[in-house]
Amino acid sequence: MNNKKTATNRKGMIPNRLNKFSIRKYSVGTASILVGTTLIFGLSGHEAKAAEHTNGELNQSKNETTAPSENKTTKKVDSRQLKDNTQTATADQPKVTMSDSATVKETSSNMQSPQNATANQSTTKTSNVTTNDKSSTTYSNETDKSNLTQAKDVSTTPKTTTIKPRTLNRMAVNTVAAPQQGTNVNDKVHFSNIDIAIDKGHVNQTTGKTEFWATSSDVLKLKANYTIDDSVKEGDTFTFKYGQYFRPGSVRLPSQTQNLYNAQGNIIAKGIYDSTTNTTTYTFTNYVDQYTNVRGSFEQVAFAKRKNATTDKTAYKMEVTLGNDTYSEEIIVDYGNKKAQPLISSTNYINNEDLSRNMTAYVNQPKNTYTKQTFVTNLTGYKFNPNAKNFKIYEVTDQNQFVDSFTPDTSKLKDVTDQFDVIYSNDNKTATVDLMKGQTSSNKQYIIQQVAYPDNSSTDNGKIDYTLDTDKTKYSWSNSYSNVNGSSTANGDQKKYNLGDYVWEDTNKDGKQDANEKGIKGVYVILKDSNGKELDRTTTDENGKYQFTGLSNGTYSVEFSTPAGYTPTTANVGTDDAVDSDGLTTTGVIKDADNMTLDSGFYKTPKYSLGDYVWYDSNKDGKQDSTEKGIKGVKVTLQNEKGEVIGTTETDENGKYRFDNLDSGKYKVIFEKPAGLTQTGTNTTEDDKDADGGEVDVTITDHDDFTLDNGYYEEETSDSDSDSDSDSDSDSDSDSDSDSDSDSDSDSDSDSDSDSDSDSDSDSDSDSDSDSDSDSDSDSDSDSDSDSDSDSDSDSDSDSDSDSDSDSDSDSDSDSDSDSDSDSDSDSDSDSDSDSDSDSDSDSDSDSDSDSDSDSDSDSDSDSDSDSDSDSDSDNDSDSDSDSDSDAGKHTPAKPMSTVKDQHKTAKALPETGSENNNSNNGTLFGGLFAALGSLLLFGRRKKQNK
């Protein structure tokens, strides 16, 4: 995928360098260079935009024989391009442009201009006529252009330095980054408006058709628009397939590297041309991973494939398949071969790698008979290499072997090189061959092929001159090469070098490569020349290695992209350039050695966190107190510096929140106020203990920040209600029954003593304490109600009946004691503290009910003559104790600067019960006993009377 470079210029158009042109047949054809505007195909390494120009001139000399003189007229083919003041005529052959002329001396009679060209005839004496006039015949010019692509209208949509010069001569181990492996995506690269046009083109005056004159500055241009699907990835490929008669390039063979550029010179795809299949395979760079919606158009310089399209004035089908889109067009080709010329030559091709000129010369096409034939080649700016043994002489056995395209099939020729001696002289810049080789006469025909290599020491643009010195005429032919649009030829034999090295993860951030630190895969690396023009781009392999190859001596710039999640480490640490980091952009100098020291280190960008706490500020002081608790469920939003929301969360049950995986930078934290709460005071104390407010700006610089807090307190309503209810019930019931029956004739004495004692004690104590502290109104209401009822009932009934003649003694003693004690104690304490209204209501109700019932019944009946003694003793004791204690209290905290109001209401006292009716009960009891005794006495007297 790397864009290769030769010695001095890119495989494309590089400003201020020499591109050489071959000049042929008397004149120079001007070759215009197409300047790429946006997207460039085929600007592969160091291609000269070559046009071939050949010059020849024929001079007549004296002849010993005499004959009637004959005028020969040399006519120019294209009057617009010749400076000679000659008569104009038209010819259906390639036009010529005038350049440096060479003198050709020839003695002949009745000379005909080649290929229907009408020449300006000068006077020629033959036989007995002698002339000294010189005549010149103008032949076609041959201009060849090499690969040149003009690109247009590229549009893309983006998907997302200090230079330190140095010169390094050390050698390093070359580890080439592994190429991306992709798939063929011919179906995802779409071409439209495909066309093959002739530039400039020449119109045949006879047929009216435009022809491609391959040796007269014409080139072919392949044009098309295209779009690239967004699904295409780095490493994917697509192809250009050229047909049988059509190839990229010009006189100069297409380079192996054919790259695709955008308007800014960035490489979109790297192409490799295979001359065997006549196919270019393009591999996409990481450009397509960085941009979407890539579309544009291009123009690519192309040429007729000489080995197949061999014949002048013949239409050939020029066909090309771009991706999956095929286009073809028939083009008439003319190379301008002049079959009547004893000496004619052409640049067969220019080698793309070493820029050597591979020349072909046709000797004695007319099959003249000579007694002298000396073939001499003089090089200017070039040299022969005798050791290469590429100076070949072939004898032609079939006239058809002089093919018009100057690319004969040498396998069908007779190689007679060993029969001749090639004499090199002038520092291998001159080669001389005697084609007679001791023969007295010969009409043999030859095809001579040579290779001329650029001479590094020469400052001239270069020229190749041929002469064929015969016994009749001395023919000269010249091929020269000139500059075009500031381009220059490269020195093909200059050595190429490599540049690159390593991208690694600097885990300890020390700026140095350590043994345990590993490379980073997938980092984009871009190579630029000293003018900032992109030459190549690549991606680091799985070991972090990258390399650019095929580079000449010079200064280069290398740019590294920062991989996602990493930060560039410190650059230029220490003195060992081989193990330091050179930063994101660095400069490397190649001087007669590889430079494998351009490294860049990165460390994983640390991630940080921020957050802390949202709490309930019960005392409204704006400070976090140890007794104050967090608030759950508060929404917190995090924004970046652009105001974009990058995270939301809610506080947990402890009021805590946090945001993680944050880079250093500026952020904003926004707290959403909980319903019913009020923002507390801000920035009242240390940053980790205060409230920061509803929106907080924060900057993270290589550290976490857990000081972003906020506090709230409850809004202005507080209500405290305390109710206390105490109820006590006591019931005491005592029943006594005594029955005595005595019948006697004796005396009866009845004594009844009844004692009933009921004691009720009720004690109710209610204490209500309400404490309210508020900034506004506080209302505390405490109600205490204590009710104690005591009921003691003692009933004693004694009945004594005695009938006797004897004494009767009845003693009845009834004692009823009822004691009721009810104690109710209610304590209500309400404390309310609020900014607004505080209402404390304490209600205490204590009810004590004591009921004591004592019933004593004594019945004595005595009927006897004897003594009867009846004793009834009733004792009833009822004790009831009720104790109720109620305490109600509520404490409501509030914030600073509020006032407190206290209200206290006294509890109602419980009524005393159980003591007021004791005397009346005792009176009733004793009255009843006395009545009973009276009845017994009366009843006894009546019985005595009856008896």
Curated annotation (Swiss-Prot):
Residues 72-83 have a biased composition (Basic and acidic residues). InterPro entries: Adhesin_Fg-bd_dom_2, Adhesion_dom_sf, Fibrogen-bd_dom1, Ig-like_fold, LPXTG_anchor, SDr-like, Sdr_B, SDR_Ig. Belongs to the serine-aspartate repeat-containing protein (SDr) family. It is a peptidoglycan-anchor. This is Serine-aspartate repeat-containing protein C. The gene is sdrC. It is found in: Secreted, Cell wall. The modification Pentaglycyl murein peptidoglycan amidated threonine is found at T913.
